[in-house]
A protein has these predicted regions:
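Short, acidic, metal-binding catalytic loop of nucleotide-sugar glycosyltransferases
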Residues: 39-51
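GT-A fold catalytic core of metal-dependent nucleotide-sugar glycosyltransferases
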Residues: 116, 121-178
């Protein structure tokens, strides 16, 4: 489904486009479906013409997602792609029994996260890669955003401009073969050669992106690192630890963004940085 905007009559020189990639699967997690419904509406109804979005979801949610997309009146473009969890390439590479083992060692399972959460989190780069392969919008830059990352209600911005209406600005997404990602907590000196990160968070995996070369490089590094975690029987259900391994061993491909806590939730600071 596409909700395509009209071409502007005062376009100047052509420039590239950014495809925003996200996914939603109604699985047991820390938050219930009604909470996600609010967050999904917060995001999809506030993005404008700059936003060309690809949304992966389960077959039973395609109609719901298309209905939300149709309510956007700011000129954003959407493509909803049906894909069952059992079709994930991640499961072809790492069978379900490996994720059952991962759940048994999860230090935070009590918060409500599940095997399905692990599969979705560790498939983010596979979703982006699939969107790049289809290249629906002819983009040379791609960014990932968690579907539940726009948590402030729309009316909270009623007295100021809607920052998301211009999200993402092409020129604000890195074009130097680096991946933009938020650094939540600096790495200690002794962590710079660390291979396995456990139950620590340094990077926000909720949002990241860059040009296609940067994404391809991160894709390669991420799944090599995930191999190390899983083959070593180390917990890797949460993608943020695997991203840390990639970062400390390949710092040259990351553009680490220091968030300003005055600009909202630091986990989702790239909404501000890219707008």
């Amino acid at each position: 489904m596409s909700n395509m905007s009209n071409m502007s009559n005062n376009e100047t020189e052509p420039k590239g486009t950014v495809t925003v990639v996200t996914a939603y699967y109604c699985v047991k997690s820390k938050h219930d479906p009604s909470q996600y419904d609010m967050w999904i509406n917060n995001l999809l109804l506030r993005v404008g013409q700059n936003c060309k979005m690809v949304i992966f979801t389960s077959p039973d949610l395609v109609e719901y997602m298309n209905a939300v997309c149709k309510k956007n009146d700011l000129g954003a473009s959407f493509t909803v792609i049906s894909m069952e969890i059992k079709e994930f390439k991640l499961l072809k590479r790492y069978p379900l029994k490996m994720w059952v083992q991962q759940y048994a060692m999860d230090p935070q399972k009590s918060c409500g996260r599940t095997i399905e959460c692990y599969l979705i989190w560790n498939s983010k780069l596979m979703f982006v890669k699939e969107a790049m392969k289809r290249n629906i919008y002819g983009s040379d830059k791609y960014v990932w955003v968690d579907i539940g990352s726009c948590r402030a209600p729309g009316d909270s911005m009623s007295n100021e401009s809607n920052e998301l209406e211009h999200f993402p600005r092409y020129e604000n997404v890195s074009n130097d073969d680096k991946v933009d990602i938020v650094l939540l907590r600096p790495y200690a000196a002794e962590e710079m050669n660390q291979v396995i990160f456990y139950n620590t968070v340094h990077l926000s995996g909720a949002m990241f992106g860059g040009n296609t070369r940067a994404i391809n490089r991160l894709y390669e590094l991420f799944y090599k690192a995930l191999d190390v975690y899983l083959c070593g029987n180390c917990f890797a259900g949460c993608d943020q630890q695997v991203l840390s391994t990639c970062c400390v061993h390949n710092p040259e491909i990351f553009n680490l963004i220091i968030p300003d806590s005055k600009k909202g939730d630091v986990w989702f600071y790239l909404y501000h940085h890219w707008s």
